[in-house]
Each structure stands twice: as C-alpha cells, then as structure tokens.
Amino acid sequence: MPSSVTALGQARSSGPGMAPSACCCSPAALQRRLPILAWLPSYSLQWLKMDFVAGLSVGLTAIPQALAYAEVAGLPPQYGLYSAFMGCFVYFFLGTSRDVTLGPTAIMSLLVSFYTFHEPAYAVLLAFLSGCIQLAMGVLRLGFLLDFISYPVIKGFTSAAAVTIGFGQIKNLLGLQNIPRPFFLQVYHTFLRIAETRVGDAVLGLVCMLLLLVLKLMRDHVPPVHPEMPPGVRLSRGLVWAATTARNALVVSFAALVAYSFEVTGYQPFILTGETAEGLPPVRIPPFSVTTANGTISFTEMVQDMGAGLAVVPLMGLLESIAVAKAFASQNNYRIDANQELLAIGLTNMLGSLVSSYPVTGSFGRTAVNAQSGVCTPAGGLVTGVLVLLSLDYLTSLFYYIPKSALAAVIIMAVAPLFDTKIFRTLWRVKRLDLLPLCVTFLLCFWEVQYGILAGALVSLLMLLHSAARPETKVSEGPVLVLQPASGLSFPAMEALREEILSRALEVSPPRCLVLECTHVCSIDYTVVLGLGELLQDFQKQGVALAFVGLQVPVLRVLLSADLKGFQYFSTLEEAEKHLRQEPGTQPYNIREDSILDQKVALLKA
C-alpha cells in the first residue's frame, strides 16, 4: 500500500532490483546470471508483506486481462491463463527489475492473431521459437540491435496497435457476430451491421467502461496513506486503494454476476465467454506438426506459414519488455541489465511453450500496478503466478458467465493509453522530420504489421544515412576561410565535404587558404584519409594551404600514420590563422618539423 512504499523507499532504491555489476569474479558473474542471489540474502519480513500485497494486486489484474487478451489473440480463453504464470516464476530467478511482470499483453496478442491463424498449435510453437531467438540474442549479447528501432517507429506501431485492438473489440462490445478479422473489412462490416447491435451487450459494455474509468480516476487521486493518520481514515483509504487497483477483477465479477442473474431466470441478453477448459495445462513439448482433416502440416510448413512473425514477434516482445523495464528502473532509481532481460524473456517463452503458452512479454499496465503496490523484489511474481494457477484449477467453471462485452471493455480501457496523441504534437514542435517514420509505420501497420515496422525502420535508417552522408558544416568567412563539420566524418560524408571545400576555397578567384576545424570529429576511416590526402594535393597545386585544427588524439594518430604530404595541424585556430596569413615560404607558426616527428613517435607508440 502507499504508506509502505514510502517507508521502504530507501531500501527499494538501493537493494533488490539493481542489476549486479559486471565483474569477472565468480560470485559477481553468478549474481549477474542469477540476480536472485543479489537480493535473496537480505530478504526481510517487511519485504515479504509488500511483495504479497503487490503480487495479489497484479494477480487480480492479470486474470481478467489474460482471458480478454486470449480473445485478441483469437485463441480459447484458457490460453490466456496458460500464458500468465510461467513468466512469474522464471522472472523470480532471472529478472533484474523488481517491478516488471511478464505475461500476455495486448500488442503480443495482436501479433499472435496475425501470425498463428487462430490455431493454438501455431501459437505455442511461435512461443517456443520466439524464446529460442530471444535466448540466443541474450547469450550473444545482441541487445544493441534493438537500438536500431527508433522511438517514432515504436510509437507508430503501438498507436496503430491500440486502434486495431480497440476497434477489434467494438464487435464484442456491441454484440455483433461473424465480423471478419482483417482491419479494413472489420471497419466496413461493423458499420454495415451496426443496426444489429444487441442492446444488452452494448449497455453492459458501456457501463463496464464507465466503471473502469471512474475507478481509474479514483486510483489516480487516492491520497497516500500516512502512519500518523487515524486508523479509520487509513482503513477507508486502504480499501479504496485495493478496490481501484483490482478494478478489472471487480468489474468482470460484477458483469458475470449480472449475467448469472439473468441465466437463472431463463433469459440471457448477453453473449457469454462460454466453456473454458478446466484444470492446469498438461506439460508437453510444443507441437512440431499439426494433423488436420486435409493431412499433416510439417514443422517446415508451419515455419513457412508463420513467416515474418518469427522476426517480428520476438523483436517486438523484447522491445516492449525492455522499454517497460527501463522506464520503471529510471522512475525508481535502479539499473537493469538488458542482455539478462533477453535471457529471462527468452527462457520464459521457451518454458511457457511446454504448458501451452503463447508469446509473452513485459506488461506496462500490470508493471505499473506492481510498482504502485510497493513491490520490493521479483518475489511478488510468485504470488501472481500461484493465483493464476489456482484460478485455472478452481475457477474456470465460473468464467462461463463472463460476458464478452465486459472483457471487451477491459481490453479497450487497457489499450487506450497506448494511443499517444502527445507524440504527434511533440514531434511537430521538436523535429517535424521524425513524423515521417512515425506516420509511415502507423499507416502501414493497418495493412500488415511487418510491413509497417520494416518500412518505418527503413525510413529511419535512410534518415540516419542521409545525415551521415551530408553532415552540416559551419563556415566562417574572414581573412582565412574556416570550415567546421558539425558532426563526425565517415566515408559517406567525404565526397560532400570535398565538394564544399573545393567550391568555397579552390573554385574561386583567387584560391583561398582554408582551416578545417575538426573539434567534433572523433574518428575517421581510410576513405576519409584518402580524401583528405587528395584535398592536400589539390591545395598544393593551387599554391594555397590547408591546415587542421582541433584534432582529437585518435584522429591525429591516424593522419600521422598515413604520412600525408603537406599535412600540418595546430592546437588552436588563432595559431592556424596567424600562420596562414604569413607570406609563402615561412615556417609554420609555433610548430617545427622535429616537434611533428616527436609527436608522431609518441602517438604511434600510444
């Protein structure tokens, strides 16, 4: 509860949840691979109480969401619950964030529906293969590859996913049946058949949405509980906090109770979830082939059918989970290990496939509940996992009465925050060009998810390459021409730099001396060295000088190693300008050949 979070604030910011420091020593290396060893020795009874409350709160949120997300994935409802518990146990041992909860999410469920054709066997196999890919990325420390997906691309995808998922639940909210799943067909048929709306489902769905909104607003405005408050005030605020935190479970239970009340009267105005397979899932290897009425689909054919999903699903799963982990680590003042997170997510999906789970990742909503509940360690996930298992074993018969419109309300309210309207205004104000990859991703994701992500990433990459090939330069006109590249120099930029130098210094009458100010150049490659050598020759032919200023040690070392004819450099711009204003034939100002040789020997030995 809020008071406990405050009381444990210092312990939570300095103890568990911190990624162990990378060290070659055996204990540190073991802690890095098994983060539980870093916080378990100092585990306390106070942390146990906080973790229990947080785990219970997350569990009451996870169960109705799991049922709802299975609908988004196009799978029977029990598969949502099958996917909701394995991450709790794996992350207990391997996670580096105390706040993150792994399980089914709206975005993962949407991707699963795209690539598994609503077939549980495909979904389970996709979880296994995604886990293998994610685990391999963690072992090979390939987490840096995620940095090539820019923030506008991620925002474009999540916004499109929010629209797709939210609109996809309108049919359940209104009680419409036999609506096709492809987005554009879904929009067309929903409006075409709007007159077929079932009043009972629509009213119940809207009431559930209103209740969820009111409870969320109450949750956001519940004042923190302080120990000095009177017991009655603390109790009342604690009850409000508990009720608003478990709002999904309360609303779904309310809707199920209403539906059951109608059922006993013999009249049912709602479309119900229906039968849910009872009991715990069997432990078995993922299906590497599927037998249908038309024959057996081999493993190779299943992989071919999933196609781009084998890249998109593991990639987006990692992006979503690490983004959530980093956000809460920054908020709560601790660090995570991104590569260790890859291992945790990968192993979760691999082991989850043994219990019929579809791909999972970090959930922003449930992680927020976890953090706000005052969780102290990943042990809170154990309570959540046990609660999900108990619901599978004892409550599945009650899920029959949950109206689909109530689950649709839960999904719509969960994905609404994913559509970030502020990002469009922010990018318009900060850098309008970044709207291009965002809009490309957003629009194309309505066609095919992989095309949207690929096109957005490609546009971002082209923008990056263009800035590398055409770096901005600052030019100072004076007695001596000074040209300063605003960023580093690499081989794509050399031709553009050469053209600008020639046009400003040598293709004018009379030719002018030039100082190349290289303060912002941190490194150069061999192509740049060759280009600079050619420029030095061009300047010598015209009888003017090209001097270098502000060379950093790595750059100077490379240029001295190349033995460029006519190469001269100065420590300050004033020295270079004073030298270049002298008559031809004089020695460089404040620099001698022997000092160049001494510096060259010293740099090459460094």
Curated annotation (Swiss-Prot):
<dbReference type="GO" id="GO:0016020">
    <property type="term" value="C:membrane"/>
</dbReference>
<feature type="transmembrane region" description="Helical">
    <location>
        <begin position="52"/>
        <end position="72"/>
    </location>
</feature>
<feature type="topological domain" description="Cytoplasmic">
    <location>
        <begin position="272"/>
        <end position="307"/>
    </location>
</feature>
<dbReference type="GO" id="GO:0005794">
    <property type="term" value="C:Golgi apparatus"/>
</dbReference>
<dbReference type="Pfam" id="PF00916">
    <property type="entry name" value="Sulfate_transp"/>
</dbReference>
<feature type="topological domain" description="Extracellular">
    <location>
        <begin position="95"/>
        <end position="100"/>
    </location>
</feature>
<feature type="transmembrane region" description="Helical">
    <location>
        <begin position="198"/>
        <end position="218"/>
    </location>
</feature>
<feature type="topological domain" description="Extracellular">
    <location>
        <begin position="219"/>
        <end position="250"/>
    </location>
</feature>
<feature type="transmembrane region" description="Helical">
    <location>
        <begin position="442"/>
        <end position="462"/>
    </location>
</feature>
<keyword id="KW-1003">Cell membrane</keyword>
<feature type="topological domain" description="Extracellular">
    <location>
        <begin position="463"/>
        <end position="606"/>
    </location>
</feature>
<dbReference type="GO" id="GO:0015116">
    <property type="term" value="F:sulfate transmembrane transporter activity"/>
</dbReference>
<keyword id="KW-0472">Membrane</keyword>
<dbReference type="InterPro" id="IPR036513">
    <property type="entry name" value="STAS_dom_sf"/>
</dbReference>
<comment type="similarity">
    <text>Belongs to the SLC26A/SulP transporter (TC 2.A.53) family.</text>
</comment>
<feature type="transmembrane region" description="Helical">
    <location>
        <begin position="342"/>
        <end position="362"/>
    </location>
</feature>
<feature type="transmembrane region" description="Helical">
    <location>
        <begin position="375"/>
        <end position="395"/>
    </location>
</feature>
<dbReference type="InterPro" id="IPR011547">
    <property type="entry name" value="SLC26A/SulP_dom"/>
</dbReference>
<dbReference type="GO" id="GO:1902358">
    <property type="term" value="P:sulfate transmembrane transport"/>
</dbReference>
<keyword id="KW-1133">Transmembrane helix</keyword>
<keyword id="KW-0812">Transmembrane</keyword>
<dbReference type="GO" id="GO:0140900">
    <property type="term" value="F:chloride:bicarbonate antiporter activity"/>
</dbReference>
<dbReference type="GO" id="GO:0019532">
    <property type="term" value="P:oxalate transport"/>
</dbReference>
<dbReference type="GO" id="GO:0005886">
    <property type="term" value="C:plasma membrane"/>
</dbReference>
<dbReference type="InterPro" id="IPR018045">
    <property type="entry name" value="S04_transporter_CS"/>
</dbReference>
<dbReference type="GO" id="GO:0005254">
    <property type="term" value="F:chloride channel activity"/>
</dbReference>
<feature type="topological domain" description="Extracellular">
    <location>
        <begin position="329"/>
        <end position="341"/>
    </location>
</feature>
<protein>
    <recommendedName>
        <fullName>Sodium-independent sulfate anion transporter</fullName>
    </recommendedName>
</protein>
<feature type="transmembrane region" description="Helical">
    <location>
        <begin position="120"/>
        <end position="140"/>
    </location>
</feature>
<dbReference type="GO" id="GO:1902476">
    <property type="term" value="P:chloride transmembrane transport"/>
</dbReference>
<dbReference type="GO" id="GO:0070062">
    <property type="term" value="C:extracellular exosome"/>
</dbReference>
<feature type="topological domain" description="Cytoplasmic">
    <location>
        <begin position="363"/>
        <end position="374"/>
    </location>
</feature>
<dbReference type="Pfam" id="PF01740">
    <property type="entry name" value="STAS"/>
</dbReference>
<feature type="transmembrane region" description="Helical">
    <location>
        <begin position="101"/>
        <end position="117"/>
    </location>
</feature>
<dbReference type="GO" id="GO:0005765">
    <property type="term" value="C:lysosomal membrane"/>
</dbReference>
<feature type="topological domain" description="Cytoplasmic">
    <location>
        <begin position="118"/>
        <end position="119"/>
    </location>
</feature>
<dbReference type="InterPro" id="IPR001902">
    <property type="entry name" value="SLC26A/SulP_fam"/>
</dbReference>
<comment type="function">
    <text>Sodium-independent anion exchanger mediating bicarbonate, chloride, sulfate and oxalate transport. Exhibits sodium-independent sulfate anion transporter activity that may cooperate with SLC26A2 to mediate DIDS-sensitive sulfate uptake into high endothelial venules endothelial cells (HEVEC). In the kidney, mediates chloride-bicarbonate exchange, facilitating V-ATPase-mediated acid secretion. May function as a chloride channel, playing an important role in moderating chloride homeostasis and neuronal activity in the cerebellum.</text>
</comment>
<dbReference type="InterPro" id="IPR002645">
    <property type="entry name" value="STAS_dom"/>
</dbReference>
<feature type="topological domain" description="Extracellular">
    <location>
        <begin position="396"/>
        <end position="398"/>
    </location>
</feature>
<feature type="topological domain" description="Extracellular">
    <location>
        <begin position="141"/>
        <end position="147"/>
    </location>
</feature>
<feature type="transmembrane region" description="Helical">
    <location>
        <begin position="251"/>
        <end position="271"/>
    </location>
</feature>
